[in-house]
């Protein structure tokens, strides 16, 4: 449903939302990555507060006061030993829903190196597990393949990253990007912006801790110290979990919860599998279909 608005416009005359100028639109399920890379156009910082009004819309007449991670008592743990990983898994297993976030060296989920995974099951407490090899991931395989609800932001990216590293994450899922795209399709859905608008919170920015990458608008995350990356990634998981509590309520109030649960979310692993495996198409058939759709 989120992927076929242009066809809807042709069929029903509804004007489709204007395409973003960014090369990686956050609400495009077929975009290759979620990464917090430098935007194509840095939006001007509004001089107003982003008070929530039900969908994250800014109130331009309120003064902006954003809190940061240091304004809250928090516990972000680096799970870099077998003992720490075991303790993390034991704690997460007590919950039937938790959030996770992957960190990689680049924007390609299938080829770039996995640096670590963050987990969070309650606000202001999260873990970051550095990944140096397959053995580290084996410690969390039962979690990722277990029955708990997995929450994330642009989960398709994370599913593909872990699939490329030998783990097929099982649902159910909750994706904060998809949830916001469903209830507020005309707005941007980046996690940093949602944190400002819905939580009045300013996140750690990757551009402030990473070196410039080889390509324009890319960042090199490979040299970030584990402690710094750990705080950044743990905060990502923490804030995404907090956003999910708000967005779950908003999706329900919007009357689109059934659509979200039965159509949008089940498509996540399907799309991830398609991108991981690849699909074979006949150019002639695509051209024929394009002509037919264009004639509608």
Residue positions per predicted region:
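Generic beta-strand/beta-sheet core signal
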Residues: 100-103, 120-122, 153-154, 162, ...
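Membrane-interfacial loop-to-helix junctions in multi-pass inner-membrane proteins
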Residues: 255-258
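Active-site-proximal helix-loop-helix substrate-binding element of RNase H-like nuclease domains
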Residues: 65-76, 108-253, 263, 267-271
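A structural signal for well-ordered alpha-helices, especially hydrophobic packing surfaces
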Residues: 8, 99, 244, 248, ...
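A short structural micro-motif
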Residues: 16-18, 216, 293-296
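Extended, well-ordered alpha-helical scaffold/bundle regions in very large, multi-domain proteins
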Residues: 261-296
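Long, highly charged low-complexity segments
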Residues: 1-117, 131-142
